[in-house]
Every structure is written in structure tokens, then in C-alpha cells.
Amino acid sequence: MIDIFIKGGFLMYPIALCSIVGISLIINKFIQYHQILKEAQLSLEEIINKTPKIMQPIIDATKKGCNEKEISVIGTRQVRKIEKGLSWLSLIATIAPLIGLTGTVTGMIKAFMVIEHSTTVNPSMLAGGIWEALITTAAGLLVAIPIHIGHHYLEKRADDIAFVMREHSTNLYMRHRNGI
């Protein structure tokens, strides 16, 4: 495995970094979203009594008598906090194959340089550049595909959280407005 990494050339390092950062973000967000969604399943009474961290600013605004628009702005701010980091996953899923493609180009340049500087070309002389081209392309795609899937999954979960938060916010506002 290390031999393949080395044959991929210097661009394997940024591809590996993309993989590490992407997987770390996915794991972090998955745990965060799981906890938030677990709290979001609480009833309105439980939310008021337990006050999940994500709902705290909304509950505080409701108790202060903020209007529906103000509560909506606070809710949007909370959703943005939840979504923080998702754009990095999108970026990683986009640039990993581009880095791989750059490795394809540099590998093919190396192969053509061998052809240019040799009077007779032996296929094994071209192998290094071709190895680099193929390995970096594959590595870029192997990083991008699961990161893209993780990004899509987490975006859906963030949308679910935002929906539940809006629903609870509306219910809290209506309850407070009606004096319940």
C-alpha cells in the first residue's frame, strides 16, 4: 500500500490530507447531528424543561417576548451553526479528483519527457509516469466519492434538524403568545 502511495507521487499528500480532513468532518458532524436529532425528538414540554443546547437561544427569545420574525432570525443563526463545516466537505469532494487529475497530467508529462529524451523507448521507462497518472486519478476519486456521499447525507440531516427546529420554534412562539 505504501509502495502505491509513493508511486502516486507528491500529489498523493494533498489527496491524503483531503481524505483525513473529510473523514474527520463527517465523523464529527455525524455525532453532532445524531445528538441534536435525538434531542429534537423530545416533546415540547421536555424541550422547555431540558432545554437542548441548540434550542436555548430560541427558548430564551420566546421567554423575552421576541416576535416571530426575531425568533426566525435566531433560528436561522442556529441552523447556520449546525451547517458549519459542510461547505468544506463539498470543497474536498470537488478538489480531490482535481488534484488526482493534476497527477494524471504530471504523470503523463513525465512519461512524454522520457520519450523525448530517449532514442529507444522501453515500456518500463514509461511506467513511472503512467503509474503516477493512474494512481492519483484513482486516489482522487476514491477520496471524493465517499466524501460526496457523506456531504449529501449530512446536508439531508441538517435539513431535518432545521425543519424540527422551525416546528418547535413556531410551537414555542404560539404557546407563549397564547399565554400557555
Predicted regions: what they are:
Residues 131-149:
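Hydrophobic alpha-helical transmembrane segments of polytopic membrane proteins
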Residues 12-25, 90-97, 143-147:
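Alpha-helical transmembrane segments of integral membrane proteins
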Residues 87-92, 124-137:
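Cytoplasmic-entry segments and transmembrane alpha-helices of multi-pass inner-membrane transporters
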Residues 3-42:
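Transmembrane alpha-helix/interfacial motif
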Residues 31, 35-121, 147-180:
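Predominantly long cytosolic amphipathic alpha-helical stalk/bundle segments
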Residues 3, 115-117, 123-127:
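Membrane-interfacial hairpin junctions
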Residues 9, 23, 59, 100, ...:
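Residue-level signature of catalytic and energy-coupling elements of molecular machines
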